[in-house]
Amino acid sequence: MSDSKEPRLQQLDLLEEEQLGGVGFRQTRGYKSLAGCLGHGPLVLQLLSFTLLAGLLVQVSKVPSSLSQGQSKQDAIYQNLTQLKVAVSELSEKSKQQEIYQELTRLKAAVGELPEKSKQQEIYEELTRLKAAVGELPEKSKLQEIYQELTRLKAAVGELPEKSKMQEIYQELSRLKAAVGDLPEKSKQQEIYQELSRLKAAVGDLPEKSKQQEIYQKLTQLKAAVDGLPDRSKQQEIYQELIQLKAAVERLCHPCPWEWTFFQGNCYFMSNSQRNWHDSITACQEVGAQLVVIKSAEEQNFLQLQSSRSNRFTWMGLSDLNHEGTWQWVDGSPLLPSFKQYWNKGEPNNIGEEDCAEFSGNGWNDDKCNLAKFWICKKSAASCSGDEERLLSPAPTTPNPPPA
């Protein structure tokens, strides 16, 4: 840096000398003109001396200022060069960074496309073949559903009371299940599946699984048809037998709606939700029934058993709302004296305005009518023949006596 400053200083010195020489030349000419005008006298000499001294002082005073300006210009040029160098350096680094970024981007794209195309193609072809193979498989789901429906039908028929018939029906249904599972024609399988579904629904609606003999005979005929198939090809015979079996089931008597229980010519509904006593009356009326009114000891034992099995507090249609201490059924009939034995020990006690009767444990209890409890509805059953009615009616069971 010092080497570059010395030539600059020399140039500045020469420039100052030229400026001084030019000024002296111009001043000399002025002096001569003045002397020519005024003549050669002492006054002229003094004036000339004074003028020369003043000019010299002015020029000397200018020299440091010029040197200072030159130094400032050099510093400014140096600073500009330094900034330019830094800018060029940063520009170079940024261009390198940009180039590296672009290369990395291209490399990333290239690497992303590198997975083994041959392996991918092989996997794709294998998946395609597997998809086609699975698509050609027979409808296993339908066969499985047929199997499940037959299993449920077997369980439903297996609940019939006559154990000897039940075992034979169970075995025949097991063989039928295996035979139908092997049938090849899908269209016939679909028809069989639909018929079995309808048959399942029909059998499921039977209140007490009646007409065992007729079902047993139809299953025997169906077994003979299945056993006589040489190559499992006579599916039409199986189909016809199923149609006949379905018709036989549909002819069976349905004295009570689904989810109602048949007993001695009446149907009973045990609720799964809870209401107060008045709302329970309304709920029974909405289904064409009434809150249960007990007419016999057998009916009482049957209902008490149903309630105690579920361990529920259940409303009956009995209260003393009209007259305290006078218990009356919702149909207006009074409570018979012989029925008072069904009250639990110490009941009814009318503690806190307890005016409605409920099944509680192994007997009856009075409680507040506004409490929510389960309830039992009762209505007459549909007409069936005497034989069927005997099959539908379970034998009454006497509940355990209340604890002492």
From Swiss-Prot:
Protein name as annotated: CD209 antigen
Gene name, Swiss-Prot/TrEMBL: CD209
Keywords: Adaptive immunity, Calcium, Cell adhesion, Disulfide bond, Endocytosis, Glycoprotein, Immunity, Innate immunity, Lectin, Mannose-binding, Membrane, Metal-binding, Receptor, Repeat, Signal-anchor, Transmembrane, Transmembrane helix
Coiled-coil regions listed in the entry: none
Additional facts recorded: In vitro, is a receptor for HIV-1, HIV-2 and SIV and transmits viruses to permissive T-cells.
GO process annotations (BP): adaptive immune response; cell adhesion; endocytosis; immune response; innate immune response
Superkingdom of this protein's organism: Eukaryota
Transmembrane segments: 38-58
Annotated Sequence repeat ranges: 96-118, 119-141, 142-164, 165-187, 188-210, 211-233, 234-257
Annotated region described as 7 X approximate tandem repeats, given as residue ranges: 96-257
Residues binding Ca(2+): 347, 349, 351, 354, 365-366
Residues carrying sugar: 80
GO MF annotation list: D-mannose binding; metal ion binding; pattern recognition receptor activity
Functional summary from the UniProt entry: Pathogen-recognition receptor expressed on the surface of immature dendritic cells (DCs) and involved in initiation of primary immune response. Thought to mediate the endocytosis of pathogens which are subsequently degraded in lysosomal compartments. The receptor returns to the cell membrane surface and the pathogen-derived antigens are presented to resting T-cells via MHC class II proteins to initiate the adaptive immune response. Probably recognizes in a calcium-dependent manner high mannose N-linked oligosaccharides in a variety of pathogen antigens. On DCs it is a high affinity receptor for ICAM2 and ICAM3 by binding to mannose-like carbohydrates. May act as a DC rolling receptor that mediates transendothelial migration of DC presursors from blood to tissues by binding endothelial ICAM2. Seems to regulate DC-induced T-cell proliferation by binding to ICAM3 on T-cells in the immunological synapse formed between DC and T-cells.
Lipid bilayer topology: Single-pass type II membrane protein
Organism of this sequence: Macaca mulatta
Domain C-type lectin: 263-378
Membrane topology, Cytoplasmic segments: 1-37
Motif interval(s): Endocytosis signal: 14-15, 16-18, 31-34
